[in-house]
């Protein structure tokens, strides 16, 4: 901002302080003001300034730089603006230290990066600190492209990059997913000899970690001389972000036991995530103990990671104990507890927690809607949908995908379609939720059309997509289409069929009366010893008098795999009765008694809507 604009902008503030009144001992007073600035006592410094005539205390760059830095330190932006006005009036805006102090003030306390940029574009001489501050400000404000533009601008002015500007540039590349450009900056780092710098090496490890290049992240780490805790945490995080949880745990123990380094809160949070995703409750408890030993147990971020770990490991009671012991709770900790109950099928409890929450973030809405879907509680789901709308929250892909899932599972396919059609942003979860909704509600042809449209738009179907489309084919008797999709998933998309896909195919073939084809398909599968899959086929076989021999084979196979599973005995006994083999039916019942097989009483519930 040039001098005229600055004077116009700050004229209203210039008279708010430094009111002149004659006094003495100016040099002593200036020294006292500088001393007060060091101590962060801004109010007292201003009092002395206001009691002194302006001619007695010269307007020096050192004085104004100190005052501006103190404003920054004590979070007083209004006084900072007033001093900014006096800087302009005194003609000190060209001084480098004053300019950098102003830049720091606006970056930390100002209304936005636009105003900070105006200060940066002022008349002061920029140095490495100025350019670094500007880049860091843009990165912090998630304006990553602008951060890189500042880097280019800096180089065009003939200034050389330092480790801080390079670190900001690499961080910007990380968030933009620009791995190739990040590699170029990595080359510049090596050219300048900064590869030994822990700070920039950690940033490089982060670049590769968040962009699915964990091998390169490890390579950067291995080249670090005596990596510190931040470096170890960076590569731990890289492994964790790429689902390499075993490697992350191994690295943690190497750091803690082998190198004797004391992990910080970020390290513990990362390794607890690994334990949770691996369902390693014993190791999670061990790390919980280390947290307490190291005095980090009361950190709200770490405690939220503990909640998440216990929830994923199925230990909701211990998660609740951690939560109850927290001195401070934030939306993350509430969300972690809510997610723990939901993941473990305690949907009613999850809904209770949601109602207790004072501050609800969007993640909580997504989680509680999953709980509603698990209970088929569409009426409550609609109530939560209403809360979401009343908050003016539109366009959240997680919440709106959860709404589609809820409405689909509750039979409200039209509501699911309306939510889907209004979404401005969709991801893979959204596509799969809508595809599943169509499949579960008998809209097989629409599901096939939707799937084909998805592929045409360049959306690559995943594991879940094929479960949904095979379910759709099964529910509407589209046998040929189902066979084609089953082959397509491995041949064209490299997706190895899992238990769920075989279950869909067996159900499809069983509904069509193709029992022997289903039996042969299952015999060739790697999951052929999964009794639940044979159970899928046994139901339709046992209900078909012409398939009694196949049903008999399957039931006996199930009895071998799971001798205590009651349904194989019950279905076979019922089939024998249906075809007049009452003696065989009685023998099966006696076999149940000898083996101590108890029949489980079924239960169900509905939600009226």
UniProtKB/Swiss-Prot annotation:
Task: Give the record's keywords alphabetically.
Answer: Repeat
InterPro entries per record: E_motif (IPR046848), Pentatricopeptide_rpt (IPR002885), PPR_At4g14850-like_plant (IPR046960), TPR-like_helical_dom_sf (IPR011990)
- In the record for this protein, the PPR repeats are positioned at 25-59, 60-94, 95-126, 127-161, 162-196, 197-227, 228-263, 264-298, 299-329, 330-364, 396-426, 427-461, 462-497, 498-532
Q: Which GO terms describe its biological process?
A: RNA modification
Superkingdom of source: Eukaryota
Q: Which residues form a coiled coil?
A: none
| PANTHER family (UniProt xref) | EMB2261, PENTATRICOPEPTIDE REPEAT-CONTAINING PROTEIN
Q: Which family does it belong to?
A: Belongs to the PPR family. PCMP-E subfamily.
Question: What is the protein name stated in its UniProt record?
Answer: Pentatricopeptide repeat-containing protein At1g03540
Any one GO MF annotation of this record? RNA binding
Task: Give me the ranges of the annotated region Type E motif.
Answer: 533-609
Quote the Gene3D superfamilies the UniProt record gives: Tetratricopeptide repeat domain
